[in-house]
Amino acid sequence: MLILVVGLNHRTAPVEVREKLSFSAKSLQGALAQLKSYPVIEGCAILSTCNRTEIYAATLEMDDGLNAIWDFLSRWSGVGISEIKNFTYSHTLYDTIRHLFRVAAGLDSMILGETQILGQVREAYQRAIEYESTNRVLNTLFQQAITVGKRVRTETGIDRNAVSISYAAVELARQHLGSLDGRSVLVIGAGKMSELTARHLVANGVSSVIVSNRSFERAVALAEQFRGRAVRFDELYRCMEAADIVISCTAASHCVVKAEEVSRVMDKRRGRAIFMVDIAVPRDIEAEVGNLAGVTLFDIDDLKNVIDQNLAERKQAAVKAEEIIEEELDGFMKWLGMQFVVPTISALKKWGDEIKQKELCRALNRLGNISEHDRKVICSMANSIVNQILHVPVAQLKSYALTTEGHLYTEILQNLFNLDVPGQKPKKQPAPAGIKEPVLAKKG
């Protein structure tokens, strides 16, 4: 059994191509059924996110399996096969397994070590199970990938440090304020970055969200997402008097938070400290605000320094993660290799047993009336001869099963002995140039 993947991601294809080759949750059942209908596909699963689409398949024929996946993608999306090949990558067997393990660990993501992808891998597997498109090999592969993803995060901490602007702001707030439970935040601006930062703050315990924006309607829309309160822009200093945290990210071309006004706010706060983060470019908060007593101010450059440091730590963790993946990959390959050779070994032993039984029957019939003792001696000798003849090829095949050449030697053995292995088709090797194919005489 061979495992393949054909995919595209943010590195290989622009968004206008990725969106054509994406699969919604509603379309997944039909897509898996269509892909599974190809005779060469024994099992399949589809991983589709905003940054990647990957088709995983189990097949008996590598080239035919790849062609089936490309044909499926073309028919499903309406994009030509040649164009799809320009934007996709493909891996087989060993490289497929390593690739999925790296994906689940967050090592192949746009943001190194991000956590969302592990849940997406789990979801892809669960949908394949639900829609009955997978098989035993893919089941074990995805289960192991999920285990690898968990192990990497537990043992390396690759996902512990913030590498986005919005989350870095939250991390700094937590470092300076301790627990964020019950804290209040004033968000100045109602754009995407303000929304992301507010969302992270609420997820980390902030209980009160106030949004101030020049467009009051947009402030209301953002505040409603967090059961917060919207205030008009001329009320922001009054609201600042009670806030623990201020996040500012407007599109203004000049500073909207003045040091003189914040100084008055701090007088009214009577020594109670305030934490402020200016995410805007150009800056929203005058730099002099950071010099005021009781004010801790960070700007976008401070956040980027935090992110750079955290990225360096994640890259260091990624080195350990790769070691874990190689260790897990070795274990999975041993399991997979044995799954492939065990049916062949059984077929070989069956082949030997059939010959033994046929020849024993012939010999015993010729010998006629012999004692039970002699019969047992002859049967024991026949068993011993067959077992000794098969011992070396069986032992060698088991040892090759643990290498990348396992499939090759298994196929050679199947061809040499013309073994009928359920679910595996021995490939008929063409005769070398200049040599005629042998003509086998018909029996009888």
UniProtKB/Swiss-Prot annotation:
Short name of any one Pfam family annotated for the protein: GlutR_N
Catalytic activity: (S)-4-amino-5-oxopentanoate + tRNA(Glu) + NADP(+) = L-glutamyl-tRNA(Glu) + NADPH + H(+)
Biological processes annotated in GO: protoporphyrinogen IX biosynthetic process from glutamate
Annotated S-S bridges: none
Pathway: Porphyrin-containing compound metabolism; protoporphyrin-IX biosynthesis; 5-aminolevulinate from L-glutamyl-tRNA(Glu): step 1/2
Source species, domain of life: Bacteria
Important for activity (site feature) positions: 99
Keywords: NADP, Oxidoreductase, Porphyrin biosynthesis
EC number: 1.2.1.70
Residues annotated for NADP(+) binding in this entry: 189-194
Annotated positions binding substrate: 49-52, 109, 114-116, 120
PROSITE patterns tied to this protein: GLUTR
Family to which this protein belongs: Belongs to the glutamyl-tRNA reductase family.
Further comment found in the protein's record: During catalysis, the active site Cys acts as a nucleophile attacking the alpha-carbonyl group of tRNA-bound glutamate with the formation of a thioester intermediate between enzyme and glutamate, and the concomitant release of tRNA(Glu). The thioester intermediate is finally reduced by direct hydride transfer from NADPH, to form the product GSA.
Function recorded in the entry: Catalyzes the NADPH-dependent reduction of glutamyl-tRNA(Glu) to glutamate 1-semialdehyde (GSA).
Entry remark concerning the domains of this protein: Possesses an unusual extended V-shaped dimeric structure with each monomer consisting of three distinct domains arranged along a curved 'spinal' alpha-helix. The N-terminal catalytic domain specifically recognizes the glutamate moiety of the substrate. The second domain is the NADPH-binding domain, and the third C-terminal domain is responsible for dimerization.
Subunit organization: Homodimer.
Protein name: Glutamyl-tRNA reductase
